[in-house]
Regions:
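A generic structural signal for short hydrophobic patches within well-formed alpha-helices
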Residues: 113, 146-150, 188
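Short, glycine-/small-residue-rich phosphate/pyrophosphate-handling segment
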Residues: 138-164
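Alpha-helical elements of the RecA-like P-loop NTPase motor core of helicases
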Residues: 15, 56, 60, 148, ...
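Nucleotide and nucleotide-moiety/phosphate-recognizing core
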Residues: 3-102, 107-136, 167-174
């Protein structure tokens, strides 16, 4: 049995990013998606990248930092299709929980991920979401009890659509990286400068 599956959501088109595939853009000479995947610490039992757009290139980029890649042929239909693929993979591996991280978030501190995992183990909540500066961020952990709901998601909402129907533990963290994503060239430049 796998206790915890980490899923890097790395399938999207990234249409607001005008410099090629944002996941393959580099921060400190490393692809954005690789830096994000590295935020999963050793206590995440299995790390899976869900790829779609430019799947071969993204899959090759993350191959050294994930345990496997899963191709999402429906990636153009929104983030929920990748969440579904990740939740199905976690369920297939009999996981206790799944932790989702968008692939365009290269600055999440691994200690934050560790705290989220610990909070899940200490809590009865269905989901654990990190909070910095009174705003929710990523990654978000969902207990196995949520897998059926996750595989039923549609559109471009991701797992946050469940926050109204499940018990959510908001976990205060001192990590601005839970909000730092790369959607535009300006976002990338800001990360390079910071």
């Amino acid at each position: 049995m796998t206790e915890l599956v980490g899923v890097v959501l790395a399938a999207g088109l990234g249409t607001r990013f005008e410099g090629g595939n944002k996941l393959l853009a580099t921060v400190e000479d490393e692809p954005v998606v690789v830096r994000g995947a590295r935020s999963f610490p050793a206590d995440v039992d299995r790390v899976i990248a869900v790829v779609g757009h430019e799947a071969d290139d993204v899959g090759e980029a993350v191959s050294s930092v994930v345990d496997e890649t899963i191709h999402n042929p429906e990636y153009e239909r929104g983030q929920s299709t990748s969440v579904r693929a990740g939740a199905n993979a976690a369920r297939d591996r009999d996981a206790d929980a799944v932790l989702f991280l968008p692939g365009d978030m290269p600055c999440v501190d691994p200690r934050t991920v560790r705290r989220i995992v610990e909070a899940h183990r200490e809590s009865e909540a269905d989901a654990v979401v990190p909070v910095y500066d009174d705003r929710r961020g990523n990654p978000v952990l969902f207990d196995a009890d949520c897998f059926d709901d996750l595989v039923d998601l549609t559109g471009d909402t991701g797992g946050r659509a469940l926050f109204e129907t499940v018990t959510v533990r908001r976990l205060p963290v001192e990590d601005p990286g839970i909000h730092a994503d790369v959607d535009t060239l300006d976002d990338l430049a800001e990360l390079e400068d910071g």
